[in-house]
A protein has these predicted regions:
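Conserved glycine-rich cofactor-binding loop
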Residues: 10-11
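Conserved glycine-rich Rossmann-like NAD(P)H-binding loop of the short-chain dehydrogenase/reductase
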Residues: 24-40
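Conserved NAD(P)H cofactor-binding loop of Rossmann-fold oxidoreductase domains
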Residues: 78-83
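Substrate-binding pocket helix/loop in short-chain dehydrogenase/reductase
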Residues: 86-87, 94-99
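Active-site helix of classical SDR
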Residues: 110, 145
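Residue(s) in the substrate-gating loop at a strand-loop-helix junction
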Residues: 129
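C-terminal helical subdomain
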Residues: 171, 188-224
């Protein structure tokens, strides 16, 4: 039975991706910090699933996770944190913790799994965001981290293509999704938000088709298409206004 490891599996898109892969016959390794939520999901998925309570900000813990599950066919890097607010007022340690989860854990898992995947084949799905396409005032470090994931994914994908390696890397860039993430950072997802179930289905189907960039929804596809047509300074103004409006709707106005 093929095996898939999914980080951020306790809720939202990660949980729904785990369900999608389980339905496709994958043994799933469910990774997150919330043990109780993972147990609940494992019970729902059945016997062919394992839970791993790991703080992905701890690189030693990430390395131990790999050592327990070296035979993975699909790696899904879905765990992510966000910090909303003005950059100057954001706590530096919280930002470092976010970057550890959003970037360092993802990068370490890719480095760990790629050698074996190149020998036996595999797929990597990195969950970024449409935030990767724009500068993000009031969400600056989060947007920047997703841009890193986006560029890293495409760069390593090209390296693998030139090596003719049997591995594909896909990067998933959804717009707003109705998940607990929005409540945690204190913003409203907005009227155009998609469900995590729909997002997961798009992500998994796109990954198995070998797509480089997966962008669900017409509006999201258009935003990616037009992101390079105008100066980033223009988009920064637009994003600031949108984020401020979401902040007010989410009840996090200060």
């Amino acid at each position: 039975m093929p095996k898939a490891l999914i980080t951020g599996a306790s809720s939202g898109i990660g949980e729904c991706i785990a369900k999608e892969l389980s339905e496709k016959g994958y043994e799933t390794v469910l990774v997150a910090r919330d043990t109780e939520k993972l147990k609940k999901l494992r019970k729902e998925l059945g016997a062919e699933s394992f839970i791993e309570t790991v703080d992905l900000a701890d690189m030693e813990g990430v390395a131990r996770l790999y050592s327990r599950h070296t035979d993975v066919d699909v790696l899904v890097n879905c765990a992510g944190l966000g910090i909303f607010g003005e950059f100057e007022k954001s706590d530096f340690q919280e930002e470092c913790n976010m970057l550890d989860v959003n970037i360092k854990a993802l990068q370490l898992l890719m480095k760990k799994y790629l050698p074996e995947m190149k020998r036996r084949g595999g797929k990597i799905l990195n969950v970024a965001s449409s935030a990767a396409f724009f500068p993000g005032p009031l969400f600056s470090s989060y947007y920047a981290s997703k841009a890193y994931v986006y560029r890293l994914s495409l760069a390593v994908r090209e390296e693998l293509r030139r090596e003719k390696a049997p591995v594909t890397i896909s990067v998933f860039c959804p717009g707003p999704v109705k998940t607990p993430f929005n409540e945690k950072v204190g913003v409203n997802a907005g009227m155009g938000a998609i469900t995590p179930e729909y997002a997961a289905k798009c992500a998994v189907n796109g990954m198995f088709r070998g797509k480089a960039v997966i962008t669900p929804g017409i509006i999201n596809k258009a935003s990616r298409l037009f992101s390079g047509f105008l100066p980033d300074t223009f988009y920064a103004k637009i994003v600031y206004s949108l984020q401020r409006a979401k902040q007010k709707q989410g009840g996090n106005e200060k």
